[in-house]
Structure formats: structure tokens, C-alpha cells
């Protein structure tokens, strides 16, 4: 869906955006009809039901490797660091015991989002993660939930900016600065005490809670554009407008085959990948820009967007669910991607459909929240893996890492590694 004329006018007159002017790329229904859940080159290997668990005391899900603004995953003084969304497991809490007094881990897992906290882990090996604890003390974050974002190592002094999402009440992109301290024994993240809210959905480009009570606005991922050197950020949003008011027009349809013109209730799915630009490299002041990619009539969620810059191309990845697809479309939980030669597009859906790495049909919920790193490694967490009959095992732990090859507009699954294998691409020695 293209931007309204008033929105473009505001953009042209904006102090930070300068002469930026572009139309969002449309991920069309015709593109999404090409999604093939049975293509082995875009299917994640099966996860065994006997997987190991990182912790018996906490669930983990969205995983955020410490990195620099160009995407390089870094270690510090030889220690790799990841942040994860974390929630305590409650095996002895009466509210999570069933009628027979047994722990209902499935219900505990389903309730985790309401108590999500940002925690950190460290390792000498890029796996075998040691739990470090909370990043922010209780009460530092101004909302009840701490949702995903990106930790950025700023310099060799150990300063870190954690961009994340403040949720409930509302949803805001926020930043908190702290530092990393290392020793021979381990790692400590310290002084994450002053949270600054950067921006919220504006209602012009991005849907607000007032426009749709089930709106999506989260998952900041800052980066420096390798071409212009400016600091930008992608994030998940929904296209602005009252719920149900969007039109699935010719652009959103794309060249669909006969029999696919009727889209039913697809107007309710209005996901997009948002963009903002910073005033300078400090990242203290930001201005919202129009979406880079819209999925009106295709999908309602484009979570955790992030870039890989390779071979002069911009690879823009996001994750999405089967259940958030619009009526008449389907696709696996997993990674979707778009590729272009410029930050502002236009973009092309990778592998023609957008699908890069999906769960296998026989285990549709085995993994989620993938993060594609510049070395081609892809990390994710285990959600649930089928066991006997209709039963399944809850994960809440790191999944096996896989490697994908990016070749032009195409991608290929190549290798599988150990659970939670997230090696640094570069070691930073603190001064």
C-alpha cells in the first residue's frame, strides 16, 4: 500500500528525512501464493523431541546476539553474549498445577509473554550458555513487559545501547544504555538504569492502539546504512488506518491466477516493516519514515525485521506465523526475506515467494523467532515438538543453529549445528 499524499508531503518537509522519498514495496498475494512448505531448500531440519534445555528455571525465546551497528556479531574479551526474552518457569506454583497436582508446563509457556523480561547469557564457546540474570532491575523499565529488540556494542569501552520494546500500557520503541564488564570468571551487564522512550506508532504511517486494539508495533533493529552512513532502524508495524478500513487493491493482489480474486476478509491483515532515521549516530532522536515493505491482504505480522548486507545487496529478513496469514493464503512459521540494491527499495521477495526458512509441515511449531546473522548462521528457539500421539514437548530453549546460503535473490539451507550455537564473528578487546 503506497503512502498517502499528505504523508509524503510531511516526509519531504521533515528535518531529519531530508530528501528521502520512496514508495513502500508491496508483498502481494500473488507472491505469497508461491510459498511452498515442502521445498527442502527452504525447510528447517526436524528438531528431535529429546532436545536439551538451557535452564530448568527459566523459559527463553527471542534471542538477540550482541552486535555492532553493521550487524557483526561480537564477543568481548573472549566472551560471547546473547540477550533473550525470559520468564520464570513455575513448576511448583499452584496456579500452574492441574487437577492431579502435575505441572502444566503448556499453560505456563503460553502465559510467558505477560511476564517477559530481558536477560543475558555469556559463553566462551558460542554455546554452553551461562545465565547472567536480568539486564534491567525490576522497575527500571516503565512498562510491565520487556519485549524484543537489539543490543549494540558501541565502542571498546564496553558501552552498550539496548534498543527494545516497552509494552503494556501501550507499545513504544525505547533505548537504555549500560556497559559490559568482564573477568576471567564471567560477564556482568551493569548500569542499565535510564530508559528513554524514542517513539510510538503515529497513526499516519503506522497503526495505533486507537485504530486497532490488536495492533503490532515492536522489535527495533538499528543499523548504519553502508551507503550513506546514517543510522536507521527497522521495526515491526501495521499499516495505519482503522481496523477493517484497508483496501486490497490491484497492487496488493498482484498477478493472481484465475479463481484467486476473492480475498474474503484479507483486509484485516495489514503487516509492514517500518523504518525510522536518527538525527545522528547517538541514536537519541528519531523520525518515523514510511514502511519499507507492506503486507496488506497477505499477513498481519512481520516480526523482528533485520538486515544482512552482502554482495552489494540489502537482505531484509522478518519472521511470521502461519496463523497470521490472510484468508486464502498460507505459509509456515519461519523466516521471510526481501532483497534489493538500495535501502529504500524496491525490494523483491526472496525465492519469488518471500519464504527463506520455514518449519517442516510435520512439525509446524518446532521453532520460531529466527535471527539471520551476516555469516549465514540462523538462530531460533524451540517452541514445541510433537512426541507420541497428539502430545508435544514444550521447549523454551535454544534450537539447533542452521546455516543458509544467500545467492542473489535465492537462499538455500546448507548445514545444521549444535543447539544455541551463536559464535562471534569478531572479538573486541576492551580498552
Swiss-Prot record:
Superkingdom in the source lineage: Bacteria
Stored SUPFAM superfamilies: Arabinanase/levansucrase/invertase
Coiled-coil ranges (or none): none
Residues noted as binding sucrose in the record, renumbered to the chain: 61-62, 148, 218-219
Gene3D superfamilies in alphabetical order: Glycosyl hydrolase domain, family 43
Record localization: Secreted
EC number per UniProt: 2.4.1.10
UniProt site positions, description: Transition state stabilizer: 219
GO molecular function annotation: levansucrase activity
GO CC terms: extracellular region
Catalyses which reaction(s): [6)-beta-D-fructofuranosyl-(2->](n) alpha-D-glucopyranoside + sucrose = [6)-beta-D-fructofuranosyl-(2->](n+1) alpha-D-glucopyranoside + D-glucose
Xref: InterPro entries: Glyco_hydro_68, Glyco_hydro_beta-prop_sf
Main location: secreted
Active site (catalytic residues): 62, 303
Expression triggers: The upstream region of the gene contains a phage-associated promoter element (PAPE), which also includes the first 48 nucleotides of lscB and is essential for expression of the gene. Even though the upstream region of the gene is sufficient to promote expression, the expression level is enhanced by the presence of the 48-bp N-terminus of lscB. Expression is induced by the transcriptional regulator LscR, which is able to bind specifically to lsc upstream PAPE sequence. Transcription is temperature-dependent.
Biological process annotations from GO: carbohydrate utilization
Family note: Belongs to the glycosyl hydrolase 68 family.
Role: Catalyzes the synthesis of levan, a fructose polymer, by transferring the fructosyl moiety from sucrose to a growing acceptor molecule.
Miscellaneous field: Strain PG4180 contains three levansucrase-encoding genes: lscA, lscB and lscC. Of the three copies, only lscB and lscC have been shown to be expressed while no expression was observed for lscA under the tested growth conditions.
Name this protein carries in UniProt: Levansucrase LscB
Organism: Pseudomonas savastanoi pv. glycinea
Lineage of source species: Bacteria, Pseudomonadati, Pseudomonadota, Gammaproteobacteria, Pseudomonadales
Protein encoded by which gene: lscB
Amino acid at each position: 500500500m503506497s503512502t498517502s499524499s499528505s504523508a509524503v508531503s510531511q516526509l519531504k518537509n521533515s528535518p531529519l528525512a531530508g530528501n528521502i522519498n520512496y514508495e513502500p514495496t508491496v508483498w502481494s498475494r500473488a507472491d505469497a501464493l508461491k510459498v511452498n512448505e515442502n521445498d527442502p531448500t527452504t525447510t528447517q531440519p526436524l528438531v528431535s523431541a529429546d532436545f536439551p534445555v538451557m535452564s530448568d528455571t527459566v523459559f527463553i525465546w527471542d534471542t538477540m546476539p550482541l552486535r555492532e551497528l553493521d550487524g557483526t556479531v561480537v564477543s568481548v574479551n573472549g566472551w560471547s553474549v546473547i540477550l533473550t526474552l525470559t520468564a520464570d518457569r513455575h513448576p511448583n506454583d499452584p496456579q500452574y498445577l492441574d487437577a492431579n497436582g502435575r505441572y502444566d508446563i503448556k499453560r505456563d509457556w503460553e502465559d510467558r509473554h505477560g511476564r517477559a523480561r530481558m536477560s543475558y547469557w555469556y559463553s566462551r564457546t558460542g554455546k554452553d550458555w551461562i545465565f547472567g540474570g536480568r539486564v534491567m532491575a525490576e522497575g527500571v523499565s516503565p512498562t510491565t513487559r520487556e519485549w524484543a529488540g537489539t543490543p549494540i556494542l558501541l565502542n571498546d569501552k564496553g558501552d552498550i545501547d539496548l534498543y527494545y520494546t516497552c509494552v503494556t500500557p501501550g507499545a513504544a520503541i525505547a533505548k537504555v544504555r549500560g556497559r559490559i564488564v568482564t573477568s576471567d570468571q564471567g560477564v556482568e551487564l551493569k548500569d542499565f538504569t535510564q530508559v528513554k522512550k524514542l517513539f510510538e506508532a503515529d497513526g499516519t504511517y503506522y497503526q495505533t492502539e486507537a485504530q486497532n486494539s490488536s495492533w503490532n508495533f515492536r522489535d527495533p533493529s538499528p543499523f548504519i546504512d553502508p551507503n550513506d552512513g546514517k543510522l536507521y532502524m527497522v521495526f515491526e508495524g501495521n499499516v495505519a488506518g482503522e481496523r477493517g478500513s484497508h483496501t486490497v487493491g490491484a497492487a496488493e493482489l498482484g498477478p493472481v491466477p484465475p479463481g484467486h480474486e476473492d480475498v474474503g476478509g484479507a483486509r484485516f491483515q495489514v503487516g509492514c516493516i517500518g523504518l525510522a532515521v536518527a538525527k545522528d549516530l547517538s541514536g537519541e532522536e528519531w523520525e518515523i519514515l514510511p514502511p519499507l515493505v507492506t503486507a496488506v491482504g497477505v499477513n498481519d505480522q512481520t516480526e523482528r525485521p533485520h538486515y544482512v548486507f552482502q554482495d552489494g545487496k540489502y537482505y531484509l529478513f522478518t519472521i511470521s506465523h502461519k496463523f497470521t496469514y490472510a484468508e486464502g493464503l498460507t505459509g509456515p512459521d519461519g523466516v521471510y526475506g526481501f532483497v534489493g540494491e538500495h535501502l529504500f527499495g524496491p525490494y523483491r521477495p526472496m525465492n519469488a515467494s518471500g519464504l527463506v526458512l520455514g518449519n517442516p509441515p510435520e512439525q509446524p511449531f518446532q521453532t520460531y523467532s529466527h535471527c539471520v546473522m551476516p555469516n549465514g548462521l540462523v538462530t531460533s528457539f524451540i517452541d514445541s515438538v510433537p512426541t507420541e500421539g497428539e502430545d508435544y514437548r514444550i521447549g523454551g530453549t535454544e534450537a539447533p543453529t542452521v546455516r543458509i546460503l544467500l545467492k542473489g535473490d535465492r537462499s538455500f539451507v546448507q548445514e545444521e549445528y549444535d543447539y544455541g550455537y551463536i559464535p562471534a564473528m569478531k572479538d573486541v578487546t576492551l580498552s
